[in-house]
Amino acid sequence: PAMNSLCKHLANALEIKKQTRIGEIRPADSGWDLLNDEGESLGQFDRVVVSIPAEQAAILLPREAELVGQISSVSFHPCWSVMAGFEQPLTDQWAGAFPQASTLAWIARNNTKPERNDAFEHVVLHATADWSSKKEGADPAAVAEELLQEFWRVSGMAPSAISYQNAHWWKYSTPVQKQTDGCYLNKNGTIA
């Protein structure tokens, strides 16, 4: 399944507003008023789930919400991520790997995941947080090339023809400290 499959399933019976940025969450008489970034109300809601990085959520949440204090200490590591597609299958020996002594933290063969198209070889590479921090602002094409070279090195495979590649700077990748609380809620459980 795709990463958004759960959300799509849960939203099946809901009216979804796409291409809409929430600019403010404001207390209302019966819950919360969501305003778009132009200040227009999108309606009042009993409960709100904010699923963005803590640094961004703290700006969005109302100042009187208890959550701002709770989430203000949460910080994230960055990660450069590369997706590459290959014309030929690479291997059937593994689906994922955590390389040791490498600038790569994780390698995944996405086409081996359930319900994914296995007709094409797709590899996702995640760089380590330390390496990614040092490469903030780097040229994505140069990052992709460097991480692909590292992939060939740690995998021991001979380089293969790439049909496409894309690098993405993921500013809020993983929490610096593991969060054991699950999710954060305000006192009456109306904002998570």
Give the label of every model feature segment.
Residues E145-E146, W152-G189:
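Flavin (FAD/FMN) cofactor-binding core of flavoprotein oxidoreductases
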Residues S81-E136, A142-G156:
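Active-site substrate-recognition segment that forms the wall
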Residues A13-L14, F45-D46, N188:
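Short, well-ordered alpha-helix to beta-strand connector turns
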Residues L10, V49-S51, A84, L125, ...:
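Generic structural signal for small/hydrophobic residues in well-ordered secondary structure
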Residues P1-H9, K17, K134-E146:
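Short beta-strand to alpha-helix junction loop
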Residues P1-K8, G31-D33, V124-S132:
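Helix-loop-beta segment of a Rossmann-like dinucleotide-binding subdomain
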Residues K18-D33:
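A conserved short coil-to-beta-strand element within the FAD-binding core of flavoproteins
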Residues S41-A95, M157-P159:
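Central helical "cap/lid" subdomain
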